[in-house]
Amino acid sequence: MKKNARRWIVDILIMIAAAAVYSLGVHFFISPNNIAPGGVTGISIILAKFFGWGVGTYILLLNIPLIIIGFFLLNRTTMIKTMITVVLITVFTDLAEMFVPVYDASNGNGVVAAIFGGAAMGVGLGLGYNRESTSGGTDILTKIIGRKHPDLKLGFIQAVLDGVVRSEERRVGKECRS
């Protein structure tokens, strides 16, 4: 019993660190420089720009139905940890919007913002994955599809799902500009 409780404490501490790093990458580098990553985070950034609520709020709202579906189709422990991580990402992202300045890449350093933002998000995701958690969103869909089609690599599934989101982000962006 003690070992299990200790493991959960370590897992939660690492999930806190993972969510903080991920959120800072989104807030500090990605969102202010109009870089829309794939998945729920990318959709959330676009919604925040259009409707004005915090990016973290949209991350939570879009993840609620996915988490519910995940509870029916995936490992319960993974989904509990994912739910905790999504709430942490929501809180940290919205707090960062209030208190943390952003990296302005308007001087031509958009590539730097994309690299550092992507790296921070990747480190956060990796830390979470290492503890049987996800950031929610398309990660949940990837795990569900991967379970139904074990012959497909999870990275491939994730790339396809994020590619679909990115293509829709571009289409919506073009329609909004015209």
Each model region followed by its residue ranges:
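Mid-bilayer segments of alpha-helical transmembrane spans in multi-pass integral membrane proteins
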Residues: V87-L95, F99, G110-E132, K153-G155
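Conserved small/polar residues in nucleotide/adenosyl-binding loops
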Residues: R170-C176
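Membrane-interface helix termini and inter-helical loops of multi-pass transporters
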Residues: N34-S44, E97-N107, D139
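Membrane interface segments of multi-pass transport proteins and intramembrane proteases
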Residues: K2-N4, F51-G56, D94-G108, G146-G155
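Structural signature of hydrophobic alpha-helical transmembrane segments
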Residues: L47-L61, G110-I115
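C-terminal ends of transmembrane helices
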Residues: I14, A18-A19, P65-T77, K143
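Hydrophobic, membrane-inserted alpha-helices
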Residues: S44, L62-I69, V160-E169
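Short amphipathic alpha-helical coupling elements at transmembrane boundaries
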Residues: G42-K49, D139-P150
